[in-house]
Amino acid sequence: MATIDDVAKAAGVSTSTVSYVLSGKRPISAPTRARVERAIDKLGYRPHAGARALASSRTNVIALMAPLRVGVSVPVIMQFVAGVVTRARDFNHDVLLLTQDDVSGLDRVTGGSMVDALVMMDIEADDPRVPVAAAAKQPTVLIGLPQDPEGLSCVDLDFDAAGRLAVRHLVKAGHTDIALIGSPPEVLRRHTAFAERLMRGLRDQAKISGVTVKVEACDSTPTGASEAVDTLLATAPETTGIIVHNEGALPHVLARLAERGAVVGTDMSVVAVCPTDVALSQRIPMTSIDLPAEDIGKVAVDMVMARLESEQPSETRLLAPVLTERESSADGPAGPLD
Amino acid sequence: MATIDDVAKAAGVSTSTVSYVLSGKRPISAPTRARVERAIDKLGYRPHAGARALASSRTNVIALMAPLRVGVSVPVIMQFVAGVVTRARDFNHDVLLLTQDDVSGLDRVTGGSMVDALVMMDIEADDPRVPVAAAAKQPTVLIGLPQDPEGLSCVDLDFDAAGRLAVRHLVKAGHTDIALIGSPPEVLRRHTAFAERLMRGLRDQAKISGVTVKVEACDSTPTGASEAVDTLLATAPETTGIIVHNEGALPHVLARLAERGAVVGTDMSVVAVCPTDVALSQRIPMTSIDLPAEDIGKVAVDMVMARLESEQPSETRLLAPVLTERESSADGPAGPLD
DNA sequence: TATTAATGTCGAAGCGCTTCGACGAACCGG
DNA sequence: CCGGTTCGTCGAAGCGCTTCGACATTAATA
């Protein structure tokens, strides 16, 4: 491999000049720059990342912690990941992927200065990674909202507002008996932030609107979905509006409803909280509140890069939920409220 | 951040001694080692990855190219990824994730010595990345089989054998009219290796067994699956055995078959080629040939690490397919052949 | 007991890059 | 026409680590 000195020699300049051509941190005359550039691609020179990291204390790598936990939809995780990776490249950064949610990986990459910054997904209310990340010298952005962000920046869909929006939508259409088919029990047991926030929004709005909301946890399997639907139909047969917040279970919930004779979009209104592509690839185009996973990933990178470039106060960005009406919801027994 | 010199000073030894304690490359007496180790965790010392990379020309990072292409099942990709990441950690390596299939990313990370080795997924017959990887100084393992591996190691399920096995299984059960519902047209257009190999195996065995195999490409959408099923039933109504090689379409294929009145496991035998968990999470437990994605990922890492530790000739490892009978297949019109 | 071989530790020379201060040359206004 | 800028370039000092050769010690061998 050619080194910067080889390039300097070939171009007849000093190494620092080559470095400045590369970084643009000092003015270089056009002819010199041209000579250097010619030498660079004649030799096929690539700066050594480690040497660069050592000298500049910048790695141009960010870490992405994307725990592959049971109960969370893998395609949705990947949408976040894709957003992060894509946007990181726009900032000339690469992504180091950590799939275990252990704290050890975290301080390996931060302590060892392997990365310039951190993005962490799937944050729990009381996540052990948060204090560790807060103590690191690298800026961190959380996708999700812990109880105490400890000065870290956060970004997520405003699930609280999403919950309220979903209920309002159903109430406005005349539904008074509403249910949530939610995350798998494991997810709730972990106090995953987004699940709890949606439920809070739901309940708050239900109280305000004076309607009932029955909550049913649901495994992301055909069986789990069937059970959830069955117990719902058994314990709250008057239900006419269902909110589904579980990408994996959604198709099976719809299938079970069909088997049980409930016609979605007529007898039963269903609002999904999920990425748009998931909403559209069901048997019926679903009325849904979009979970803009890829965008959130991109915003996370934007935020973390901003903090890298200049000291900035931490901020929390909650994206406003957008509900799109499609064919899975209709007016309820009380008729449209206008 | 504490440096190795700080540790040396604190322990009253030279820096090289600290280094040798860390690497174990030279014998160090127990008391010295103890003093050094105490100093290390008193200071919270972490070696600087860049400095280490520069001095040792080892980064302890491997690159994983996992292009997120249309038509390939995201959960399946993630199983490969999970296998790679997990196993890499066993070798004390982290994973740099590249999701674009462009060659530029490839030589950024190899040329810049950002990684020690490479694992590339989703290999096409004539993949432009292959020659580039072959020219890199880092060892590379391909998950998939290009036309010309150019001295690189490869690992994959033996799709050729899988195709033959699937046909043999159906023929033995008395089916003579067999069909494949395969990958999406985009995947075939890209000449993705595994899709073509499965089809080759299928056809070879069909010729040998004297049966017909109708091949139907299939989008991984409800519509795509329905269309595939419909045209199959229209153009080859005598079909009694179907092989499905398309994780995304599988549930929709089964749904459509049900709608069309074909009882899977009785009228119609279906063999899936997919990961076991996918086979088990269908409406019926599917007879399937396992695609051991996570294992393949792990093997890829094992192979690449072996080449890293000692110069070894390249090898191609094709995992033997295993068919597990479950409830989606049964004897056909000609009855069991024994 | 003299000789050789481990064993344990140190010092110093890099690894390839960035960056700071310095310096000559060209350029400005007064 | 001269002091003060600005521009373009250079040299050298690190960044924090690994690793090689050297050098004492101590243990094993004859």
Q: Which sequence ranges carry the predicted segments?
A:
Chain A
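Hinge/beta->alpha junction and helix N-cap segments in small-molecule ligand-binding domains
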Residues: 67-75, 100-103, 155-165, 181-228, ...
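N-terminal helix-turn-helix DNA-binding module of bacterial transcription factors
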Residues: 1-60, 333-338
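Flexible loop/turn connectors
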Residues: 226, 235-338
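Glycine-rich phosphate-binding loop signature in dinucleotide/nucleotide-binding domains
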Residues: 43, 173-175, 232-238
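Short beta-strand segments enriched in small/hydrophobic residues
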Residues: 17-20, 57-70, 177-187
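Alpha-helical recognition/docking segments in bacterial nutrient-uptake
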Residues: 2, 61-168, 234
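Short acidic/polar active-site loop segments enriched in Thr and Asp
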Residues: 14, 60, 116, 176-177, ...
